UniProtKB/Swiss-Prot annotation:
PANTHER family reported for this sequence: EUKARYOTIC TRANSLATION INITIATION FACTOR, EUKARYOTIC TRANSLATION INITIATION FACTOR 2 SUBUNIT 2
Protein name: Translation initiation factor 2 subunit beta
UniProt keyword Protease, yes or no: no
Family, similarity comment: Belongs to the eIF-2-beta/eIF-5 family.
Disulfide bonds: none
Source organism of this protein record: Methanoculleus marisnigri (strain ATCC 35101 / DSM 1498 / JR1)
Alphabetized Pfam families for the sequence: eIF-5_eIF-2B
Domain of life: Archaea
Recorded name of the encoding gene: eif2b
Record has Iron as a keyword: no
Subunit structure: Heterotrimer composed of an alpha, a beta and a gamma chain.
Domain TRAM: start-end pairs: 147-205
Upper taxonomic lineage: Archaea, Methanobacteriati, Methanobacteriota, Stenosarchaea group, Methanomicrobia
InterPro entries: IF2/IF5, NA-bd_OB-fold, TIF2_bsu_arc, TRAM_dom, Transl_init_fac_IF2/IF5_dom, Transl_init_fac_IF2/IF5_N, Transl_init_fac_IF2/IF5_Zn-bd
Function: eIF-2 functions in the early steps of protein synthesis by forming a ternary complex with GTP and initiator tRNA.
GO molecular function, one term: translation initiation factor activity
Length: 205
């Protein structure tokens, strides 16, 4: 006997995942960072880790790796050696959320990191999905090589502006800053320094 319309409707409603309280109020705090001498201070580090429901050590390790620097947690703050823009840190945190927080199946943040047999897995409490944690590759800018090197000269086209007014180019996992360049404007630059995933340049045209 085939199931009735009412039975099918009931089953469909059962499979619908209701929004959780965590999902309803999930908003990643904007990083509040400032330069202090030769260091950069992320003053709301603890708040960000708490909102993401991730261990501070795990988030800090990711930030240090992406910035390519040393640092430490001081109370509710994180302190990094070197000078980094607030926008750079926000970009890295967004990548962390995509890789280690958001479920790739339902797009919800109700997840946990679970390590089984040396494999770190992201498990979703909302839909039951799970996946091995892997860094997602950013969209590669076809106008540039995927592995930039210091001293390289290339043509790039900024995609948007930083708060300081510099042009910003995303190349794979790298963020490049170009002075005096507007979005959509192709310019020739030389890579002067690479710090982690941040590329510093100078104009050569």
């Amino acid at each position: 006997m085939s199931p009735s319309y009412e039975d099918l409707l009931k089953k469909a409603y059962t499979n619908i995942t209701e929004p959780t309280e965590f999902e309803d109020r999930f908003t990643v705090p904007t990083a509040r960072a400032f330069i202090e001498g030769k260091t950069t201070v992320l003053e709301n580090f603890a708040e960000i880790a708490s909102t993401l429901r991730r261990e501070q050590d795990h988030l800090m390790k990711h930030l240090l790796g992406e910035l390519g620097t040393a640092g430490k947690v001081e109370g509710t703050r994180a302190v990094f050696s070197g000078k980094f823009e607030q926008e750079q840190i926000n970009t890295i945190i967004k990548g962390y959320v995509d890789d280690y927080v958001i479920c790739s199946e339902c797009g919800k943040p109700d997840t946990r990191l679970v390590k089984t047999e040396r494999v770190l897995t992201l498990k979703c409490d909302a839909c039951g999905g799970h996946r091995p944690v892997r860094k997602r590759k950013a969209i590669v800018d076809p106008s540039a090589a995927s592995k930039p090197t210091e001293g390289a000269i290339m043509d790039v086209t900024p995609q948007f502006l930083s708060k300081r007014g510099d042009g910003v180019v995303k190349i794979d996992r790298y963020t490049m800053y170009v002075a005096n360049a507007k979005p959509g404007q192709t310019v020739k630059i030389k890579i002067t320094r690479i710090a982690g995933t941040i590329i510093f340049t100078e104009r050569v045209d």
